[in-house]
């Protein structure tokens, strides 16, 4: 009975189907919405959208050409003779892919809304703040023993991406259109997707690629963690019977033969694995307090699961297992890339149950971060805000915007940096970064008005950039009144600002 219930939980929830996504491709407002949404989410990345090309006139022409096609869904061999792709192919593909990314997210949005209405937020696995890593570091970080990390491979064949979406999107026309796009831009004769094609596709269609990539990775991650969680409930069940009764994939013979020989007949070895998982920068990172033997078995388990069921070519020799003590003093995650940027300090929390009662001191770990100056300067240099040594330069690609738009873009970057490092205790490096952005903004405005920085500031005054100095107003503090009749002092402490939508280059810096 318990196994049948687990099997039902493993099945993907298909209660929210949408069979009418394809007609939305011919709606103008979808492309406008996709463009505006992409523009608002751009922070540090150069806006490669359609500031100079995008217009509703182009969209109308695009939709008209799509309507005029008698056979839009064709094979890749006939695409060279198709006038739809021969005319300005890159622009049309980029526009449709962004619109398609918005359309295909509709079933996921409906599932999310329904989950929130039923107050079943636990079932929405994607509702995780990037700052959930900090409580993990404070509570679990000092007690872990081993870390395993490896690159997450791309699917062997493009058709696997389409097959994954078939579970969520029940619209054959949309899936055929997706297949046409993929076959048009990638080489079908290659078993593994070329890295150059991936890089080009990611740069031109970030939203579209991230959606496909996350959908693909989420599938085998969900199965793997389901089995990890269920291992606690099947300790007395024979492993071979356990796999056969769940029957989560067809190629089970080799899998069972390997694991009955290598793991034994029961799940007693899976007792309390304490496995923590992070997916970051295309890597899968496992951290555990188990022995190296169990870590190797979990690694082998994941590799066979992905290769047999999802046709993902994992290379076990590239998944390294090292003592976690090597990483405790050199932690690189979420933009904190310096070896000294993450520190665990002991702090004393004093609590009082009742007024005039005795005080209790509890010692706990406190995560303290410092702003890493070198990676941040590298990110700003990559985005052409400064040179390699941190000297501010103008942003010529923004010189065509209005003055208010230029200032708003720079202020938005500074505000997000302040929010991201709001919980840091040492911010001298952050002040230097904000100085680089302020001076880069002034040089960009001076370049636009064909003037020097000194003359421009003298003419307009320093009030033009006063928004850069409002950092303290953007930082949230928690203020607690002290429950005492003698003193009514207020205690103020640092907290992490959690309203982070997109950090882009900060959290993806290599």
Curated annotation (Swiss-Prot):
**Signal peptide range:** none
Q: Which GO terms describe its cellular component?
A: chloroplast
The record lists the membrane-crossing segments as none
Intracellular or extracellular location(s): Plastid, Chloroplast
User: What GO MF annotations does this protein's record show?
Assistant: RNA binding
* Stored Pfam families: Intron_maturas2 (PF01348), MatK_N (PF01824)
Task: Give any single GO term for biological process.
Answer: RNA splicing
Q: Does the keyword Cell membrane apply?
A: no
This protein's superkingdom?
A: Eukaryota
Keywords of this entry: Chloroplast, mRNA processing, Plastid, RNA-binding, tRNA processing
Q: What job does this protein perform?
A: Usually encoded in the trnK tRNA gene intron. Probably assists in splicing its own and other chloroplast group II introns.
Task: Give the protein family.
Answer: Belongs to the intron maturase 2 family. MatK subfamily.
The protein's name is Maturase K
| The organism of origin for this protein | Populus nigra (Lombardy poplar)
């Amino acid at each position: 009975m318990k196994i049948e219930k687990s099997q039902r939980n493993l099945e993907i929830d298909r209660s929210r189907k949408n069979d009418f996504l394809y007609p939305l491709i011919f709606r103008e407002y979808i492309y406008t919405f996709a463009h505006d949404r992409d523009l608002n989410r751009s922070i540090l990345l150069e806006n490669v959208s359609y500031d100079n090309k995008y217009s509703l006139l182009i969209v109308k022409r695009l939709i008209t050409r799509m309507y005029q096609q008698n056979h839009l869904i064709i094979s890749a061999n006939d695409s060279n003779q198709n006038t739809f792709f021969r005319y300005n192919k890159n622009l049309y593909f980029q526009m449709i892919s962004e619109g398609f990314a918005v359309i295909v997210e509709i079933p996921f949005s409906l599932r999310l809304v329904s989950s929130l209405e039923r107050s079943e937020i636990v079932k929405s696995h994607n509702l995780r703040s990037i700052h959930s890593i900090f409580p993990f570091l404070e509570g679990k970080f000092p007690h872990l023993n081993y870390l395993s990390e490896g690159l997450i491979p791309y699917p062997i064949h493009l058709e696997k991406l389409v097959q994954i979406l078939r579970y969520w999107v029940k619209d054959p026309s949309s899936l055929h259109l997706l297949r046409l796009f993929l076959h048009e831009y990638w080489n079908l004769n290659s078993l593994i997707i070329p890295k150059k094609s991936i890089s080009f596709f990611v740069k031109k269609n970030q939203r579209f690629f991230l959606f496909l990539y996350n959908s693909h990775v989420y599938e085998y991650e969900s199965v793997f963690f389901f089995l990890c969680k269920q291992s606690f409930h099947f300790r007395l069940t024979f492993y071979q019977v356990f796999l056969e009764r769940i029957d989560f994939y067809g190629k089970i013979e080799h899998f069972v033969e390997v694991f009955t020989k290598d793991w034994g007949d029961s799940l007693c070895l899976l007792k309390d694995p304490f496995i923590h998982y992070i997916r970051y920068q295309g890597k899968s990172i496992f951290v555990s307090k188990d022995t190296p033997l169990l870590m190797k078995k979990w690694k082998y388990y994941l590799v066979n699961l992905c290769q047999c069921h999802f046709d993902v070519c994992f290379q076990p020799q590239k998944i390294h297992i090292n003592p976690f003590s090597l990483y405790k003093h050199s932690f690189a995650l979420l933009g904190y890339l310096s070896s000294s940027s993450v520190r665990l300090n002991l702090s004393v929390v004093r609590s009082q149950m009742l007024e005039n009662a005795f005080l209790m001191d509890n010692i706990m770990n406190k995560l303290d971060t410092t702003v890493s100056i070198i990676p941040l300067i590298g990110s700003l240099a990559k985005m052409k805000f400064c040179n390699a040594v941190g000297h501010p330069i103008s942003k010529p690609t923004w010189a065509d915007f209005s003055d208010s738009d230029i200032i708003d873009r720079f202020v938005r970057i500074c505000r997000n940096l302040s929010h991201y490092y709001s919980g840091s205790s040492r911010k001298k490096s952050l002040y230097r970064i904000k100085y680089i952005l302020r001076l880069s903004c002034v040089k960009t405005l001076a370049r636009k008005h064909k003037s020097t920085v000194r003359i421009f500031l003298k003419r307009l005054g320093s009030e033009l950039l006063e928004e850069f100095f409002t950092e303290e107003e953007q930082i949230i503090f928690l203020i607690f009144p002290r429950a005492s009749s003698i003193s009514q002092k207020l205690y103020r402490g640092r907290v992490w600002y959690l309203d982070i939508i997109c950090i882009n280059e900060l959290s993806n810096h290599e």
